Amino acid sequence: MKKEEKINYFWKYVLLTVGGILILIPLMVTVFSSFKKTKDIMNHFFAFPNPITLDNYKRLLADGVGGYFWNSTVITVLSVLVVMLFIPAAAYSIARNMSRRKAFNIMYSLLILGIFVPFQVIMIPITVMMSKLGLANMWGLIILYLTYAIPQTLFLYVGYIKLSVPDSLDEAAEIDGADKLTTYRKIIFPMLKPMHATTLIINALWFWNDFMLPLLILNKDSSMWTLPLFQYNYSGQYFNDYGPSFASYIVGIITITIVYLIFQKHIIAGMSNGAVK
């Protein structure tokens, strides 16, 4: 290995190490603090909890964290399922026809324009519209998530199909007597597994952790709060009692971390191929 390459590798490892430390230390502090009493957090912020206490989690359960956890789970699961059911089919149709029919190119261009529209521009009109339509509830929030998920998810799927799923598969299936629906269901959809995992985790992370949309749509009815909205109000309620707040953060982190670990091996392939075209 040349001297210049060794230097490059050295600085890469230094940057990765520093980045890892900057991520792990706050995570470690959050985990430790969730098992400490508030006075121990204030006096020994970075220390291992001694003694370990579950009082913070007991208080969370007593304050109804389970209901807010359920709200977040329902919203995230339903939103992800609908995205995964319809957008791959739309992307397949667009990818196969955009080179032959101008209308599909125009449709695709219009749909992905949403990527470039800042949320702040439409934040107030969206809030007013959903309120007037009587959709200031969980169903309205799911509709908004589906709407905002279309541009990026469609962009990734179309790019992946054009790069990794050749037209010859459709032709071979047609020769064997398969119609378009059968071809998509039995051949194309299973081949999109890396992109399914990628879009699932990207959208699930967003839906689960999102704060702004629930704040705008659900804030008036506390029974419909999602976990991030509960955490925001809970931190304000127990501003001088940090233990329960840290415990609520762990409840939010651990679920989505498990989902990420399950699908992580497919994410890199899906992202690298889907963003090429």
From Swiss-Prot:
Name of protein: Multiple sugar-binding transport system permease protein MsmG
CDD domains: TM_PBP2
Annotated PROSITE patterns: ABC_TM1
S-S pairs: none
Gene responsible for this protein: msmG
Main location: membrane
Domain of life: Bacteria
Organism classification: Bacteria, Bacillati, Bacillota, Bacilli, Lactobacillales
Membrane disposition: Multi-pass membrane protein
SUPFAM superfamilies in the cross-refs: MetI-like
The UniProt record lists the keyword Cell inner membrane: no
Species for this entry: Streptococcus mutans serotype c (strain ATCC 700610 / UA159)
Annotated compartments: Cell membrane
Family according to the record: Belongs to the binding-protein-dependent transport system permease family. MalFG subfamily.
Pfam families the record matches: BPD_transp_1 (PF00528)
